[in-house]
Amino acid sequence: MPDESQRIQSTASHGLNNTPEQPDPIKLDVHGQIPPWLSGALYRTGPGTFSIPTKYGYEWKPGHWFDGLGLNHKFDIKPNGEVWYRSRKSCPQAELAIMESGARSSFSFGPSDPCETYFQKFTTFFKRAAGMIPPHPPEEDDACVTLTPNMPGFAVPSSHTTNKVNGAEYIVAKTDADTLSILDPETLKVLGPAHYQDLSPALKGASFCAAHACTDPINGNVFNHVYKFGSSAGYTAFRIRGKGSDRGHLTVLTDIVDAPPAYLHSSCLTGKYFILCIWQGDIKWCVFPPLPLITLLNKKLSSQGWVNYPLPPQYPGCHCWLGPQTGSAILRY
């Protein structure tokens, strides 16, 4: 008989198996009863593809669970207690690109694949930095960390129409980079790309951001930050209006230029303050031109992940408390 640790390990291993998409809704078996007041649409997202055969004869596998390609899920809960389910891959074109190239060109959390050579990585990023590689389709961008219905500042692309689902005209899928996707709330199809920097020229050049934006439950305002590399490197905290005639308008709260680039997965929002907790999870970057692509190249050339561990004790964390209306720095330590 396997012991408890073996049983848990065996069960957890299923989380690394490929999950096929289910684009057409199917009725699920329900054990028990769901009260009518729970009816509605439940959206979930997360990694779903962890092994992709390549034309070179080997299988691509991510070095970290977070690096699995995304799968978006929708559960339609009916007033009569029925539950219908459908799912769709978030970046099918990225899967095809991996089959063809044998590697993934976007940033990753885990160690680099040893099958990817240094020269292959350098050439890919050099070409993309030089503009020699055309923009890739939006379905190659994998945003599969958080989903927000009707997020202010964004909209359904003019070339598409959608059906409202419980008031949602569109879904914004987010990740830890300024690479968002607009989803159809009914079919989960990727309608197009989206970026925070499209909302304001002040965010131009944004690379990283928090996948978990903060939303004020009273007025619907959305708070987040971006990090920009280069000559004007630093954090930019911002607010997107959630209601009123200026809904979707982005206001920069403050710029923080004297803190190191860190991996910030989320931030904090109270009734009075928007808080950035800049911890010691510094992102690796090069000493030569500090461009975002060069930063990612440096990460990809490393045999480690893209966050600089262990935590350096000589660099204390930094908490920035910002007034959500004015953006003034109330407290910093």
Indicate residue ranges for each PLM-predicted region.
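Beta-rich catalytic cores
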Residues: 68, 209, 262-263, 326
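Beta-strand elements of modular eukaryotic interaction domains
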Residues: 33, 60-64, 161-162, 171, ...
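Well-ordered mid-protein domain cores that form the structural environment of catalytic cofactors
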Residues: 96-246
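Beta-propeller fold detector
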Residues: 84-94, 191-198, 247-256
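Long, low-complexity intrinsically disordered regions
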Residues: 223-227, 233, 237-239, 255-259, ...
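N-terminal regions that are enriched for targeting/export leaders
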Residues: 1-157
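Short beta-strand elements that form the blades of beta-propeller/WD-repeat-like
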Residues: 41-44, 57-64, 74, 168-175, ...
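Beta-propeller blade signature
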Residues: 70-74, 232-249, 287-333
